[in-house]
């Protein structure tokens, strides 16, 4: 079953997904600029999350990008920064959430170690290792359940 949900992004009718086989649930959230209550409710109870961690705020601010692009990426309809993604993770965390993939990392405005640092507090404990998707090669298959 696929359950699409809307997100705040500067595209026409942007949607993300909650996928389920009836027993297990995967939430996919990328290309969102800010947190909405509908987004959080759509991701509740997932066994696995693929979560955008697009940029580090400081790296984006200090980047060579023009001011207009920085404003777009970091704005309400742009992309999720590491700290906002950590807030989403904390809001969606429950005992059954076993798998987390950080995805859509900017090659210019983020680093895997910054993502790990931002998500560490919420993701601590007896869960599977945090997987960080490589912007070029993705990540290996993960068995959910």
Regions found by a protein language model. Give the residues of each.
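Core dinuclear metal-dependent hydrolase active-site scaffold
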Residues: 1-48, 141-145
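Class I S-adenosyl-L-methionine
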Residues: 131-143
């Amino acid at each position: 079953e696929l359950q699409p949900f809307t997100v705040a992004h500067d595209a026409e009718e942007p949607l993300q997904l909650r996928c389920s086989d009836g027993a297990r649930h995967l939430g996919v959230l990328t290309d969102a600029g800010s947190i909405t209550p509908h987004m959080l409710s759509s991701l509740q109870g997932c066994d696995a999350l693929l979560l955008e961690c697009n940029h580090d705020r400081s790296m984006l601010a200090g980047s060579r990008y023009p001011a207009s692009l920085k404003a777009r990426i970091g704005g309400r309809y742009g992309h999720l920064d590491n700290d906002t993604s950590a807030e989403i993770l904390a809001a969606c965390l429950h005992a059954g959430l076993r798998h987390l993939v950080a995805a859509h990392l900017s090659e210019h405005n983020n680093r895997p170690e910054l993502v790990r640092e931002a998500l560490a507090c919420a993701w601590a404990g007896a869960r599977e290792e945090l997987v960080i998707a490589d912007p070029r090669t993705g990540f290996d298959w993960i068995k959910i359940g």
